[in-house]
Amino acid sequence: MKTYNAYDTIHELALEQHGVFTAQQARAVGVKTTALVMMVRRGRVERLAYGLYRDPGAPLSRWTPYVTAVLWPQGMTGVLSHETALDLMELSDANPAKIHLTIPRKHRPRRRKPPPGVVLHFADLDPSDVGSVEGLPVTKAARTIRDVAAANIGPALIRQAIDDARQKGWLEPIDGDALTRELVAAGKL
């Protein structure tokens, strides 16, 4: 008969999410809060932020910082956006120094700071504006390009993003043309 081991349960969960998990997810798989606290004290688990943990036994990957950002907002999932979304979809030469995350307007954390290197944006995203890259929620190309245009990223990068989105199939040609006209009319191109 196999005995229950809280760490093994956490480790399996963390492996599925590039080493990162939330306290809420740990409880959902049967790990008690007291067991999680003991794992932190013993160094088996690292506390990244309030309710957010990393298993040092799980290998880090390119995706670990993104998963950390997405899981950080408790009770909901953030959406990778702006320059981060451009980078993940490989649209333009955007190379953001920070991870951009959009969360709903009503979800404004007062006491909790986001993980280091995460920039928060607040918007109520329509489900049709959210896609996926490597299983991570990411704003779709048209929404992303509108967001970076509103943030004044620069016309050359915006043009390149539109062209790349068309070539890679993230934007239909007719949608790319409409987006270009919209941004020209708004003075962004």
Feature names for model-found ranges:
Residues 2-189:
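Short gly/ser-rich loop at a beta-strand->alpha-helix junction or flexible surface loop bordering the NTP-binding
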